[in-house]
Amino acid sequence: MWRSIFASFVFLHGVIHFIGVAKVLGINNHTPITQAIAKPAASIWFLTALLFLAAAILFLLKKDIWLLLSVAAIVLSQFLILSVWKDAKLGTIPNVLILLVVILSFGSWQFEKRYRNEVQIGLQCIKQVKPSLLTEADLLPLPLPVQRYLKYAGVVNKPNVLNVKIEFVGQMRQKGKEWFPFTSEQYNFFNVPTRLFFMKAKMFGITVPGFHSYKNGKASMQIKPFGLLPMVSEKDGILNKAETVTVFNDMCLLAPATLIDKRIAWTAIDDQNARAVFTINDISITATLCFNDIGQLINFVSDDRYEIGDKKRYRFSTPVSNYQNFNGYNLPAYGEALWHYPEGAFTYGRFNIKAIKYNTE
């Protein structure tokens, strides 16, 4: 809604600049501008109007180039306003308002660009790698319920997974607060364990971006309204271990082919449960995987994840359901994230897979 309102505002501001063109060309002698305008200035008024119109349209289309066009239009517009200050000084107000939105939008763009750059680095690192086929023999060291799960997921006789791109839509909340909607995109790379998660949440009527980065045991998390104001900023320490749990959770639920990884030590519990210890450098985390009779993974439970808000460790679980076929792989399309506090379980996240793709380039 606000996007349409702002685009209309910029568009109208651009149209108003045609008044200068009309004044110079004598098309309308009853314009609000009473001061004389030199004829060569007509082209500048016309160009400024077109820049604002183009910026408005590109803003609606979510094309980043609107930022550059807006800055150029504002500079030209303010130059023209100064040349006829007595009649056009009020035009400074919309220029300032548009500039404010440009600055805030540029901050968000720069913040997301950091994520995009890190994704490109990850993609470049595996560009020349050719994945081998995952075979039945690769499953033999795994506990039987894990073997059944990988067969059910459809990973056998398909390429090993080097990376995965996932798009989510869902909801999140904090304890004692209302749900807020979000969309997210993430890339995981598995040779050097990497998780790059970029989220856009709707909070307080605005889009609030968040970026989680995990690289080989080192984690950081930033949530920045407009990409400028640090609402949350955490790195290293207990976050490293907490996000190692998250990375392994992603492997189990979203990239089951990676469960043959040698950094995982498996222990069979029974026909429907298995325990795993996942180690990255000096960090080891433990999780229990729960399966049903047909081989589906239905829950992931770990006691090694920290709730960053209060720096305490609680049981963490992610029950999943609604298995669907994604490009030939059977994966859970819906999942929830729960903290198990002393007073009871609390669901803080609901995730729906919008799209998933392996070995992207």
Q: PLM features: residue spans?
A:
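Gly/Pro-enriched, hydrophobic low-complexity segments
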Residues: 275-358
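N-terminal leader/targeting segments and the immediate start of mature chains
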Residues: 115-165
